[in-house]
Amino acid sequence: YKRQIYHMARKFNVDLTEILTGTAPKLDTYHLVRRGETEEVERFPGYHYEDMASRYARKIMQPLLVILDPCDEPAELVCHDGQEFNYVLEGSLILTFGDRDIQLNAGDSIYFNPTYPHGQRCNGDVPCKFITIIAE
């Protein structure tokens, strides 16, 4: 249901933070987030997201810290508008982009058009941690 809430928020131009917390983001100059102060967000099943700019109003980018547990299942492919950037902090990630699997390791990054089917999954025996920045 939280995935549906995310899409409803986008459709009606309401910030997801306002729906989840009941308070509209108010910051418009800068938003400093200290360690442990991120807001958890459920965007797609199987992904653990932490919103790194939850209180910034009218954002054009969504910076998220993502943690994926090891998994042997193929990534669920999704499409959305905008542009997307992924930067791997720890572990290894397989980005499925259309019919191609692209491996990214710590320190690797990729910038791509998310209107094409894509999905990420952890590659290996340890969780993968990466930053994604989504502009929609």
Regions found by a protein language model. Name each.
Residues Y1-Q4:
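Conserved small/polar residues in nucleotide/adenosyl-binding loops
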Residues M52, G98-P114:
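Short acidic-glycine-tyrosine-enriched beta hairpin
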Residues T38-E76, I133-E136:
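A short glycine-rich, His/Asp/Glu-containing loop-to-beta-strand
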Residues E18-D28:
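Short amphipathic recognition helices of helix-turn-helix/homeodomain-type DNA-binding modules
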Residues I67-L68, V78-L95:
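Short, conserved beta-strand element in jelly-roll/cupin
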